[in-house]
Amino acid sequence: MASAATEGEKGSPVVVGLLVVGNIIILLSGLALFAETVWVTADQYRVYPLMGVSGKDDVFAGAWIAIFCGFSFFVVASFGVGAALCRRRYMILTYLLLMLIVYIFECASCITSYTHRDYMVSNPSLITKQMLTYYSADTDQGQELTRLWDRIMIEQECCGTSGPMDWVNYTSAFRAATPEVVFPWPPLCCRRTGNFIPINEDGCRVGHMDYLFTKGCFEHIGHAIDSYTWGISWFGFAILMWTLPVMLIAMYFYTTL
């Protein structure tokens, strides 16, 4: 009887409370991470072709890892709540081992997404080179990127990466297909009416600012990639920073059982 009572009193109630609260926050954060990264993999901004052509699409690889980690955080943290309430050494040890595995995978997801994001948006020259190489090119990648750029230029009312002069200052697949005297930039750089009819095609051709989109599309593309990366990396890092002290408390709790 005395032995059973002593065993039942092992572990401070305060520590148990901290573990329960800490793991509840982790499991809720895991669900949020899961939802966030599902949104990323759905590619709502539809910029994956830009990243795929460069071979720097590991932002999406990080998102797939984070989907696994988000669900795993939910499951393991739920188990951690039960382990803390049951006060069983083997359950706490199992919790620590599982959480450590998930922690390592989430670190990989955060680092992978952030480093590849930095490569894509730190300098517009990479995206400019892709645009000039593939826009209007008669290849599968060229057709895919042409559709992507057409959609972005229409929806965001922009032209080129930095502006319409990208098409004039550099050689491109578009220039090889369309001489400058015919059209110095893609016709979709022209301002349009609500029915998508050019307001003044001749004015657009000569570069009149009232009839031509003058801003570049890089701001929109960078914002799209940043939105994906912040959701994966920085929210992931925040979860990791919270999870570490919870794991340390669990280690201490394990030594008291």
Curated annotation (Swiss-Prot):
Transmembrane segments: 14-34, 59-85, 91-111, 230-251
InterPro entries according to UniProt: Tetraspanin/Peripherin (IPR018499), Tetraspanin_animals (IPR000301), Tetraspanin_EC2_sf (IPR008952)
Protein localization: Membrane
Membrane topology of the entry: Multi-pass membrane protein
GO cellular component labels: apical plasma membrane; apical plasma membrane urothelial plaque; cell surface; endoplasmic reticulum; membrane; plasma membrane; protein-containing complex
Positions in the Cytoplasmic compartment: 1-13, 86-90, 252-257
Keyword line: Disulfide bond, Glycoprotein, Membrane, Transmembrane, Transmembrane helix
Residues linked to a glycan: 169
GO terms classed as biological process: epithelial cell differentiation
Extracellular side: 35-58, 112-229
Keyword Nuclease appears in the UniProt entry: no
Subunit note: Homodimer; disulfide-linked. Interacts with uroplakin-2 (UPK2). Binds to uropathogenic E.coli fimH.
Entry function: Component of the asymmetric unit membrane (AUM); a highly specialized biomembrane elaborated by terminally differentiated urothelial cells. May play an important role in normal bladder epithelial physiology, possibly in regulating membrane permeability of superficial umbrella cells or in stabilizing the apical membrane through AUM/cytoskeletal interactions.
Family note: Belongs to the tetraspanin (TM4SF) family.
Name of the protein in its database record: Uroplakin-1a
Organism of origin: Mus musculus
